[in-house]
Every structure is written in C-alpha cells, then in structure tokens.
Amino acid sequence: MEPRYPFVAVDVPEPEADEIGALLFELGASGVEQRDEQTLVRGARSGQVTLVASFEDHGEAMEAIAALGEQSPPLAARLEEVVGDAWRDAWKEHFAPFALTPTITVVPPWAERAPEREGERVLLLEPGRAFGTGLHATTALVAELLDEHAAELRGREILDVGTGSGILALVALLLGAERAVAIDNDEDVIEVVLENAARNGLEGRIEASAGVVEAVTRRFPWVVANIEARVLRPLAPELARVLEPGGWLILSGILESERDDLIARYTSLPRPLEHVATRPDPASPGGDRRAGRGDAGGEGWVAILFRAPGGAASSPG
C-alpha cells in the first residue's frame, strides 16, 4: 500500500502569510508552500492565499491544526492527505521561468537555459523553504527599482535585510553590484542563499549569515529590506544608521494604506531620509496585471525608495 502523507492547509489574508508560515514551521512543519488564486487552489477567496504545510506524521499535523485554532483570531485549518510520492515535486509545476525585470529572467534549476535575448540575465533560483521566488509583488517591485538604478548600483556593495532565498542580493549582483551582504533572522535559510549563489557562480561575491540589522557595524551605499510595514517602522533608525551618506534604501512589503505612515517615519528621523520615489504594483486596481502577481484583497503593494543625506553614492568610474 502506498504511503499517505499529511498536510495542513489554511486560508489566510495575504499580508499575514509570512507570519503564519513562520508559525507553521514553529509547529513542526517540514515545508510550507504558498498558493494563491493563480495556482488554482480551491477555497482561497480574493485577497487570500492558501498555505499548505507538510508534516512528518498525522499526529503532528493534528496538533498543528489544534494550535492554529487557538490563535487570536482562530485559524480554521484542515487536514489533507496525498497518496504516494508524486507530491514531492508537484509544486514545481507552478514555478516556471518568468521575467522578473526587463533584464532579468528567473529560471528554476530544473528548467535551466541560456539567455534568449540581448541584454537578458538569467537568475537560477530554487527557494527551498525560504521566502522569495520573485513571483510576489513585494519582491518584484524591489528588483525593478534595482534594475532602474543599475548605473548607481554598479560597482557598489549592498546589504539585503531579511534575505529569504537571497533573490534580491543575487539580482543586485547580476546588475553589477560588486558585493552583497545578506542577513536573515532565520538561520535555516542561509544554506538556501548560498546554494542559489553557487548555482549562478556568485558564491565569491556574497556573504550570507543569520543575524539582524541591529548587529551590523558598518555602512552600505545600498540597503534593501523586503519585510513587513509593522517591522519596517520600528527598524527605521537602524536601517538609516547602516546607510552611507548619499546611500539608497528600498523598502517593500508595504500595502498602499501603509505607505504614507512609512514615508513620514523615515523622513522625520533625526537624520531624515529623502523620499525619492514610490513604485506601485501594476497588479493593483487600475494597473496592468502581470502573470504571477497577486493583490491583497483589492489593495496593492508598493515599494519605497529613499536616499540618505550627504555625499553622492554614484557609480564609480
């Protein structure tokens, strides 16, 4: 008889997916997949995603369901079973090559290919258990801003706070950054970052470690942080501290309704940053929806570009 593998599925608001995904790992999940309407998962309403977590045995899965039901507000999770081993690679069907920016195409390792057009850069990426495939708007908006400012980025160093799969640090390196420092408070994702760097021949130009921005002791000309607005707000003094004079900061993981508060916070610091630009998600209402992008219940995402006062952070040479 073929084995039966237990999974826990729970529908959650998209802005809360990262937090609840982390909770599932704390409850013993060995992997968590995030699906939205574009992956044709039944049960997920508009503005929601379905988290599907794998567990080693049915007992752990049932304990996780009970724990989710005790959250405030309660989360209604359900047990799903998959017979046989085909599930192990089934998620790969939903991760095909796609254009992340006008010049960078994300390609999974099982679909490896060479660049197909002039100026195209291929980024080989497997997220593993880390956040960051590039399909989510919060990641793509940062990548697009980096691409647009490639001239200022070229030859510089970048700090990626909350790196996940390492996708933004690797994008920066492909665009010409000299070196990337990637940190995350989840030590389990660091191996994923280094593996993705090696896939792209970039392992000699990236330093990845578990840590928090408060422990960073030097400044950078570029800093990116794709986290959540509720985390980015209290981090404002620290993110400004690690910016060189004239340095650039990109924040993402921000809903449109949170934009003004974040801008006010970062432009009113003792060493205030200049608000340079806000980039909206083209999948938000009134924008052009692109494959692989999702909205948050009708509310779009934004990324915000700031610059520190002081000397120029222009491209050398």
UniProtKB/Swiss-Prot annotation:
It comes from the Bacteria. One of its GO terms (biological process) is methylation. The keyword Iron-sulfur does not apply. GO terms for cellular component: cytoplasm. It is found in: Cytoplasm. S-adenosyl-L-methionine binds at residues 139, 162, 184, 226. Gene3D superfamilies: Vaccinia Virus protein VP39 (3.40.50.150). Belongs to the methyltransferase superfamily. PrmA family. This is Ribosomal protein L11 methyltransferase.
